[in-house]
């Protein structure tokens, strides 16, 4: 008799995805981040669900309800800080996952890649709306600044912003709808993750060499299940060290002050994982130009399959491209640092140079270097 694992309509889907899945024999730890992102999503949905049981999305009580969660709810402080720092872990894994895709040419699976970029946008939107919910100073002013950017859209901008706000400023209506969207989006993300995996399993995984690995496949279970469990344990360990020893390390102290529309904080800045995009936004003196640069800084990822000029898929055997890749990483670190600095000399100039370099490396330098490396192959 055939194993139920292979015959049952539901179980066989799980079997083909996580058990009998043929996987390349040489994929490194950089391939762990997909499963880690899955774990992050599960942690965020579970902790978020328990937070939603005690949270109230009203301007009068939102801040107090978060305080109540931390003080009065059993292990409420743990749930709240796991959720807040879980978001940081989520973005660390996301950036590493995307970086892996860029380095090893995984973007040539363009359906998988494009859904991944849409997922990145969806997670960023969810994180932004989640940051507004505690209704502290940075929540309120962050929401005001970022939503206001839409007013840069010609003709419909102002109307659009007031429609999103549900009034003439960020207020009760805004908070309530942000909570509703923040609750629903993770489930939409989960559905998109399934589509992401569906397209990935049409082609199979890439591997560090970038070569076709059909001739050398191993079953996902037990080899990669045990490898994923190791990654998950490390992820949870780092998350719990962060939560239990320095839960406010990555947060902003301004968010412990209740939202006050009459008092603007000296430095309005988003959470650390948005700082690179915020720096690009601020580096252009024009409002519409800044908004376009902000959107393009992420949307540019969709151009990678078109901009790939090399005859090799992976950067494993392309030292010049490797060098530019790591300069791009250093540039993103620079942008992240600049995003958290005040708008004054020399930070303005550094930010503008780093922003120009970011787009230059992706649009011009990497494709040109790849063509040069193709020539080197003929020597």
Curated annotation (Swiss-Prot):
Superkingdom field:
Eukaryota
CDD domains named in the record: cytochrome_b_C, Cytochrome_b_N
Binding annotation for heme b b562: 83, 182
- Which parts pass through the membrane? 33-53, 77-98, 113-133, 178-198, 226-246, 288-308, 320-340, 347-367
The cofactor named in the record is: heme b
Q: Single Gene Ontology BP term?
A: mitochondrial electron transport, ubiquinol to cytochrome c
> InterPro entries from the xrefs?
Cyt_b/b6_C, Cyt_b/b6_C_sf, Cyt_b/b6_N, Cytb/b6-like_sf, Cytochrome_b, Cytochrome_b_C_euk/bac, Cytochrome_b_N_euk/bac, Di-haem_cyt_TM
Q: Which UniProt keywords apply?
A: Electron transport, Heme, Iron, Membrane, Metal-binding, Mitochondrion, Mitochondrion inner membrane, Respiratory chain, Transmembrane, Transmembrane helix, Transport, Ubiquinone
- UniProt: heme b b566 binding residues: 97, 196
**Which SUPFAM superfamilies does this chain map to?**
a domain/subunit of cytochrome bc1 complex (Ubiquinol-cytochrome c reductase), Transmembrane di-heme cytochromes
- Location within or outside the cell: Mitochondrion inner membrane
Annotated membrane topology: Multi-pass membrane protein
For this chain, one GO molecular function annotation is: metal ion binding
Keyword Mitochondrion recorded:
yes
Cofactor: binding details = Binds 2 heme b groups non-covalently.
Please give the PANTHER family that the UniProt record associates with this protein: CYTOCHROME B
Protein role: Component of the ubiquinol-cytochrome c reductase complex (complex III or cytochrome b-c1 complex) that is part of the mitochondrial respiratory chain. The b-c1 complex mediates electron transfer from ubiquinol to cytochrome c. Contributes to the generation of a proton gradient across the mitochondrial membrane that is then used for ATP synthesis.
Q: How does it assemble?
A: The cytochrome bc1 complex contains 11 subunits: 3 respiratory subunits (MT-CYB, CYC1 and UQCRFS1), 2 core proteins (UQCRC1 and UQCRC2) and 6 low-molecular weight proteins (UQCRH/QCR6, UQCRB/QCR7, UQCRQ/QCR8, UQCR10/QCR9, UQCR11/QCR10 and a cleavage product of UQCRFS1). This cytochrome bc1 complex then forms a dimer.
Any other noteworthy remark? Answer: Heme 1 (or BL or b562) is low-potential and absorbs at about 562 nm, and heme 2 (or BH or b566) is high-potential and absorbs at about 566 nm.
- Protein name, entry field: Cytochrome b
Origin organism of this chain?
Neotamias durangae (Durango chipmunk)
**Top-level taxonomy:** Eukaryota, Metazoa, Chordata, Craniata, Vertebrata
